[in-house]
């Protein structure tokens, strides 16, 4: 892995999804995702599922934290993500924002406190992709933590019905 810091601006959905894949590949310990509903990031694609699975199998200490404004899409249309949640229920946590965090509108994917993809607004494809920069990543870590604190567990690894 190259240790030089790099920053790239992205203007389209394909570039955005490719940047997400690259940042996920750089993850060694933690992945933090904040998104409106995961619909635009290719999160149900086979390749994304495989990347997450490799990350989670690399170490039992690896963690995937996801915060969404809306969870209906993941529950209804993301069977691969739900499969991962069932298989790695000790490592994946999917939260939904509370009212105070619903103003957040800039999706994030952060890997290991040093790499991120920051979409400027969930309705627009423009984004920034940064690798190997702890200083630039720090404000986004703080923002993610604020959103995480203003959220609650929303998607369980099992469905219990009568």
Please annotate each region the language model reported.
Residues 1-32, 36-162:
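PLD/PLD-like phosphodiesterase catalytic module centered on the HKD motif
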